[in-house]
Amino acid sequence: MRNKFCALLVMVYVLSFVGFAEALTLRLAGQNPVAHQNSVQMENFKKIIEEKTGGKIKVKTYPAGQLGDYALIYEEVSKGTIDMALITIPPKFDQKQQIYFTPYLVSSWHELYKLFDPNGWMYKKVSGFHDKMDIKFLGFFMDGFGGLGLTKEASKPLDPKVPKNVLCRIPNNDVAKLTMTSMGYRTVSVPYADLYTALQTGVAEGWYGGAAVHSYLGFRDVVKYYYPMNIYTELEQWLINKKTWDGLSPSDQKLIESTVAEINKNAVKIAEQEEIMYQKKLAEAGIKVVKITPEQLKPTVDYVRKMVWPKLDKVLGKELTQELIGEYAKK
């Protein structure tokens, strides 16, 4: 009788863990509107993981900043109160995270495919940044390039030495300020959540960053001009809390990594197609989309690199800046 009772306890214990595994839910937070590819691919990730684990792992998605802006989401992933995220990385916890805003690391789609290779320099550096925050870095999701959405026309936008007479919103980071100042713009820092109102009321006359899709989905009612300046790589990152990650089986870890890798592999191609599509949509909405060829852009690229890159050591530190310049200066 005692043996039967012990066997029953063992069975209950085992079944409780099976039940726990079946009930595991990963909370995945994002920042962009539901129509944005970022949010679409969060749903794709959810579908793949749930199907391939037979429902053992479920994914609950929270797009469009439902759990807060990207700075808050990042902090909560670090704490473990949110399991996963696909977000922009705030620099408030580590100034070196501003490396993503380095202007003109690359300036063409062909170069963009190579920039964030999983075996490359940038990928390894970024992994180290997140390790310090108890976060596992899973990969880059490429949105394309950051352009300029303005409510008024810029003066000679392709001559960085000419004052543009536009007050442009930037995020609260030093690299963005260095970049826009070098291009002749006055700047004001406004939280992204308040950007629409700032553009509407004239607190800002434009905004730095965002591909055509962002200006269309979020600001087409207020911007009047879109300049595809390809200033920096517009991207988000897949993250998972380290404790959550360590609690997964090796096979589940492999599945998550491979799923993210496959999604990211297709992201640049989709972003390139969407840039064309959303530039067209912007034009159809009455916004002037300024066409810029690589040849026309090159003087700006060369000038901004010359003016901004050497100053990055004040933000990124001398060692990291020298590594960055050595890695990308000739590309």
Regions found by a protein language model. Name each.
Residues M1-K4:
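Positively charged n-region of N-terminal signal peptides that target proteins for export
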Residues A7-F17:
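Bacterial N-terminal signal peptides
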Residues E22-E111, Y123, H130-D131, K136-K331:
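N-terminal secretory/targeting leader peptides
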